[in-house]
Amino acid sequence: MTDKNPIVVMKGITIEFPGVKALDGVDLTLYPGEVHALMGENGAGKSTMIKALTGVYKINAGSIMVDGKPQQFNGTLDAQNAGIATVYQEVNLCTNLSVGENVMLGHEKRGPFGIDWKKTHEAAKKYLAQMGLESIDPHTPLSSISIAMQQLVAIARAMVINAKVLILDEPTSSLDANEVRDLFAIMRKVRDSGVAILFVSHFLDQIYEITDRLTILRNGQFIKEVMTKDTPRDELIGMMIGKSAAELSQIGAKKARREITPGEKPIVDVKGLGKKGTINPVDVDIYKGEVVGFAGLLGSGRTELGRLLYGADKPDSGTYTLNGKKVNISDPYTALKNKIAYSTENRRDEGIIGDLTVRQNILIALQATRGMFKPIPKKEADAIVDKYMKELNVRPADPDRPVKNLSGGNQQKVLIGRWLATHPELLILDEPTRGIDIGAKAEIQQVVLDLASQGMGVVFISSELEEVVRLSDDIEVLKDRHKIAEIENDDTVSQATIVETIANTNVNTGKEA
């Protein structure tokens, strides 16, 4: 493959923001007919590198060559004119237009009286057919097809401009296995036509299935370029995060189960807590310094129980005892006042506030508990923000950067920092490691253990059973909106234990099915 002339050569790319060097002398070379993965943990510089190649960011140093010609992109149009097309995780198409109109947008066929829509849709059909998408009618409204199909339409649109380079940024994050298979079939067609594909994904299985070559970044620096087939997974992980896979596997490995002393009272003790149509009545107790895992399949009631504990949803049954006193946690404000915090599973829509800075996102919940007419003094605010950015290793270390410009893992850290700033006694974390890379995931798992060791009660909700088992002292197992078991975690408990419990328990009787 290396006997081909490269389509793109990026050398010594450096991009600086105020007080932060996002990229520091990074190289990237893309070859025709290859799928090339850009690898690195969240915050490594992958998105910044893509934005340099697509003209979103101007580079401070370095050079970009496309087809042997030096390029200086002053915007995305310059990059498109050079043959670089991008399909983002959130497809940037016009849902009010048809499939064909989206494919040909900006390249419509014209006649003597303006756009010839018949010829435009015929041309769109041709481009769709070239990619094996003959089944899609170009007249179909884009809004009526799935996200997966919309991504394929976006790729067809890239082919209209005769793209030399196709950038796919996390295209599989919302796809099921069949949709991923269809996407990969299209990617292979595009690759075999001579296009260079730059692929970004945090799914290692997919990386090893579809890519030919890897470039690894870490902390904004170039680490290495390797061939995928020659690179063991543990070696790749080590290059991405600066730690070996063996080191990561030790997180939680020596964790002793938190033993409850006789007469000790829980932080939270709920009896028969439920909400009709949401989750059946549940008993749960959570002690100081204890990690309680909520495990179950999608729709089991994990999130619903977490929301009831926080007051995000109002229960219609049960009692709630907090530090030995009966309370009514009926809304999030009351929960915060009682030192209960909840980090949502949907961090983008319900968690972070993208247009606000890192500083503002960390401070907003604490300010809410004090009231808007009692602003946090600047010296105190600076100390709080600095403390949690350092403790959680938020990168880039720029508190005045809009949080939407951070990677997913760093956004999650900011969200956790927001709740830690309120000094909770109970922290409910719903899917805190979803959609982030292995390095950030390991950091957040370690944070959970550290918080528990400091005496905080933690509810850990995750669809990844392995991390529930690794981190939890007790595991509440849910199925079909019922609590079906409580497992005291020890060396005999594994993912298989939970799976067997779910598979073999009748939700109505609580006994083996």
Curated annotation (Swiss-Prot):
It is a peripheral membrane protein. It is found in: Cell membrane. One of its GO terms (molecular function) is ATP binding. ATP binds at G40, E41, N42, G43, A44, G45, K46, S47. It catalyses: D-fructose(out) + ATP + H2O = D-fructose(in) + ADP + phosphate + H(+). Keywords: ATP-binding, Cell membrane, Membrane, Nucleotide-binding, Repeat, Sugar transport, Translocase, Transport. InterPro entries: AAA+_ATPase (IPR003593), ABC_carbohydrate_import_ATPase (IPR050107), ABC_transporter-like_ATP-bd (IPR003439), ABC_transporter-like_CS (IPR017871), P-loop_NTPase (IPR027417). Residues 8-244, 262-505 form the ABC transporter domain. SUPFAM superfamilies: P-loop containing nucleoside triphosphate hydrolases (SSF52540). Its EC number is 7.5.2.-. GO terms for cellular component: plasma membrane. PANTHER family: CARBOHYDRATE TRANSPORT ATP-BINDING PROTEIN MG119-RELATED (PTHR43790), GALACTOFURANOSE TRANSPORTER ATP-BINDING PROTEIN YTFR (PTHR43790:SF9). The complex is composed of an ATP-binding protein (FruK), two transmembrane proteins (FruF and FruG) and a solute-binding protein (FruE). Part of the high-affinity ABC transporter complex FruEKFG involved in fructose uptake. Can also transport ribose and xylose, with lower affinity. Probably responsible for energy coupling to the transport system. Belongs to the ABC transporter superfamily. This is Fructose import ATP-binding protein FruK. The gene is fruK.
